Curated annotation (Swiss-Prot):
Protein name per its UniProtKB record: Protein Tax-3
Residue span of region Disordered: 326-350
Segments for region (Transactivation): 289-322
Entry annotated with the keyword Transcription: yes
Residues annotated with Phosphothreonine modification: 48, 184, 215
Amino acid sequence: MAHFPGFGQSLLYGYPVYVFGDCVQADWCPISGGLCSARLHRHALLATCPEHQITWDPIDGRVVSSALQYLIPRLPSFPTQRTTRTLKVLTPPTTAATPKIPPSFFHAVKKHTPFRNNCLELTLGEQLPAMSFPDPGLRPQNIYTMWGSSVVCLYLYQLSPPMTWPLIPHVIFCHPEQLGAFLTRVPTKRLEELLYKIFLSTGAIIILPENCFPTTLFQPTRAPAVQAPWHTGLLPCQKEIATPGLIWTFTDGSPMISGPCPKEGQPSLVVQSSTFIFQQFQTKASHPAFLLSHKLIHYSSFHSLHLLFEEYTTIPFSLLFNEKGANVDDDEPRDGSQPPARGQIAESPV
């Protein structure tokens, strides 16, 4: 029986989806990043792309049938995301080849370029406007770039994203050597595989330095390196920890990235962006609830959680929303201990 336009229910998983006529409205092919199939299967609510011979679940992005199935990353689908408001599978509007980005964005980039060795360096802010943006039909949301030895997410702008890939941007600035410094004990081939997965899954434009490792997997966009490799960043270097960080977004659009876990199952959050926030939190790692209580991050930004690898899927999602983990008096040293030295990261209890 045909569905009426409006909200329906997934026959596979039971949570609500948006239904358009007989079928769910069109979705985005995770290989090309564009609109390849105008219709989805009505009963199973699965998206298909005849051109690439791929079928996937539009809710969590899980590939059901594809010759490239082993290359498509599996993104987690948290229960908190399954609401009638967030599970609309809609076609986002196409954008112009050169999006109209407000000048205030570039001004903020220059103004809030993070500290390096206690100095502000404006190279990122000066070169960013000259970079190219995605082709029409893609959905740019964030820009990844390298600050220090950290992978940082710059909030750009957000359209109405489909639910297939709501967590991954479409313009990625990546310096493999810095990425390797941040993701400890990750071989070069693994980093190349990671970029290839993102490329296949999202159709993202990946911008690499001109002289970085040549790859036979895909042809990334080449651009002059924004920064040379810088291996002594703010993130604590712990050789015994190989898990990556998590990327968040502040309410003012400033990015924040987490460091390695100080304890098992506990993310250690380290700020990498605006001058004010950097000065406030540069000497300690804060729980998300602490930053949330100070109105520094949106609650909805937790839904923009980005997982580079699958190790963090073991962290209970409820832990990230545990208000009891926030310590408002974290500035005060406890038990007579001295506060950490400048540039060091202290672990905050969760």
